[in-house]
């Protein structure tokens, strides 16, 4: 609710007051600091990691939602409420300045009921997939609680190590602590 009240609503109201029409997708890059919520950026596009997580939670048809928005209709957006999704980005060594490329990647098609693996900076090589950018993969763990989703994502990463890559080990930690209060 804080995000809606302090970021979204004032932004939309300011755009209306300035006569700035907009139809599309806007996402706010936010950070929670010791001094509270801070806006880092606004983007008029889908952000990859954010969208990959949100799409797992969205029950509505995205194409229909976009069509409704473009045609001036109020979209019906339904979200799954019986599960959580947590995404961890796997980045190439050297990211963001000079990411290593051509890192051999494991078989991403192997079945895993607990996680969805999204490829990002990836290309086909003669022996399989190779890294081709800074952000290589997103591992999306799903669970009945945020803690369960986090556990599944990190369990997958531990069981499938990739040389010359790294990922943050604290994704979801603050939210989990906050929801446990």
Please report, for each region that a protein language model flagged, where it lies by residue.
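N-terminal loops that bind phosphate or other acidic moieties
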Residues: 1
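Active-site "cap" helix and flanking loop/linker of ATP-utilizing ligase/carboxylase catalytic domains
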Residues: 4-27, 43-114
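Short beta-strand elements
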Residues: 28-32, 37-46, 121
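Short, well-ordered beta-strand elements
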Residues: 40-42, 135-142
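Generic long, charged, amphipathic alpha-helical segments
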Residues: 101-138
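Short, well-ordered alpha-helical segments
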Residues: 139-158
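Short arginine-rich
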Residues: 155-171
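A cross-kingdom feature marking charged/low-complexity
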Residues: 171-181
